[in-house]
């Protein structure tokens, strides 16, 4: 899914400045938004072509997290939150979920675990076992999102077959204390830099709609850009009941699209993925994420909420004249062009139906 954020750009493609980004982030309506989307789409096509990568995940360990991230229903500090709670699942179950994701078109598969970091040797050993099996038994590119991991543990995971490490900055430094107080922004940077130092491909982004200003969205993008990450996952807040952010008003679809487009113009070489919250925040305009510059998205379920059936996501990609990008593992890909439907997919509890929205054009 991720190659390098330092790739050579085609002639005529240059990242925009922070000052220009702070101006364009307010282009959220009419001809200004149309022009912004067209510009982002042109950059996406010039740098990344018309391939889209899909990412699948497993919630390998859920709930009872000691952190207080205000958006997350897995925090043990929020009594009203209702995320599932269970210990680390077995390596076999992780591999089986990866096989399902691969058949659904996933290029990358991420093992996600709640908590500050993996704190038990048994948990780390389970992930190592799963990574070895993923490399041996599937074609997907293995990723992990395991919190504030340190260099020795990350090295073990890399030796077991880890290709990508995911750790979100979540938001701008100036807004971070409004989101989380139990760890610092700099602690997050330490983990990301440790993974980069080991040669792992980096995936780091955040969530929009957590009360930040448009200017702070640009600040956040500048910080991600300066880390030189390969992939930027962009989520839109889907407020979870019982969390401090459950009553936040959603940002508009136009704001979502404008932010994506600005991020593409700021980071033309990065792979930009639209992940959680796209159904709730964009509704009938989900397909416009590619016009706004994204070249990847999620397939299947999220951590604690249901996603669309895989065939709907694959169909959305294909209707835009785009094709799925296969893994770079050199192995035969299990995706045969036909993603599972709702009837075939083990979905989680139903989410509220996305609101219908008029198309932009």
From Swiss-Prot:
The keyword Glycoprotein does not apply. Residues 47-278 form the Radical SAM core domain. It is an enzyme of class 2 (transferase). GO terms for biological process: biotin biosynthetic process. It comes from the Bacteria. Keywords: 2Fe-2S, 4Fe-4S, Biotin biosynthesis, Iron, Iron-sulfur, Metal-binding, S-adenosyl-L-methionine, Transferase. Binds 1 [4Fe-4S] cluster. The cluster is coordinated with 3 cysteines and an exchangeable S-adenosyl-L-methionine. It catalyses: (4R,5S)-dethiobiotin + (sulfur carrier)-SH + 2 reduced [2Fe-2S]-[ferredoxin] + 2 S-adenosyl-L-methionine = (sulfur carrier)-H + biotin + 2 5'-deoxyadenosine + 2 L-methionine + 2 oxidized [2Fe-2S]-[ferredoxin]. Its EC number is 2.8.1.6. [4Fe-4S] cluster binds at residues 65, 69, 72. Catalyzes the conversion of dethiobiotin (DTB) to biotin by the insertion of a sulfur atom into dethiobiotin via a radical-based mechanism. This is Biotin synthase. It comes from Anaeromyxobacter dehalogenans (strain 2CP-C).
